[in-house]
Amino acid sequence: MAAVLSPITRQVSKEPRELQRVCVDIRLEDVQDCLVYDRRGGSVPFKNLYQHTKSVIIFVRNFLCYACKEYVEDLSKIPEDVFEGKVLGIRLIVIGQSMHHHIEAFCTLTGYPYEIYVDPDRHIYQKLGMKREETFTDSAQPSPHVKSGIFAGQMKSIWRAMTGPIFDFQGDLHQQGGAIIVGPGAQVHFCHFDTNRLDHMPINWLLQLAGVQQTLDFSKPKIMHV
């Protein structure tokens, strides 16, 4: 009997002209039973996030990281009707690595209205193989979603840590994040692991890889409905 292969996805480079694909082995079975926690501290198995639908799952470095904050601010600009189309049925999920009591403040700060969980022990980060150091290259493209420079951004992060109601750094400062598109079931469609704080996958690319045809303009401010 032939061996059953682990689900394999594609890591997509962010070259502007051509998408070059390299196979990456993603073992969902290693993380499917890991617990993630919602803003109330309730736990759910990781597999519940993608078992019945296709999910775009974004792992951020930590909630104090200025680059992650600005990236999630742009995620908050995605109109709800992009995901509400029943033909697509896509879930957008952010996962951080802080304690659950930081979720509410982060959502208030960024205006992020969609699903968010935390993996405080970084079990999923580690088992999926996300990096725990930063690598910068001369050829790296700047993130279209991060507006602050490194020095100013770091000062903002330190200030938020010092003035927050609970002084801590809300996760491992060296841990990098990534993005995966998975589901329904064990299907793995795409994977990108960040090499540094500015290496987020452009949101429009993620949406298109998930099947969304609409292209969004993230240079515009978020529209608030009252």
From Swiss-Prot:
Top-rank taxon: Eukaryota
Record-linked SUPFAM superfamilies: Thioredoxin-like
Coiled coil region boundaries: none
Listed Gene3D superfamilies: Glutaredoxin
Record-stated family: Belongs to the peroxiredoxin-like PRXL2 family. PRXL2C subfamily.
Protein name: Peroxiredoxin-like 2C
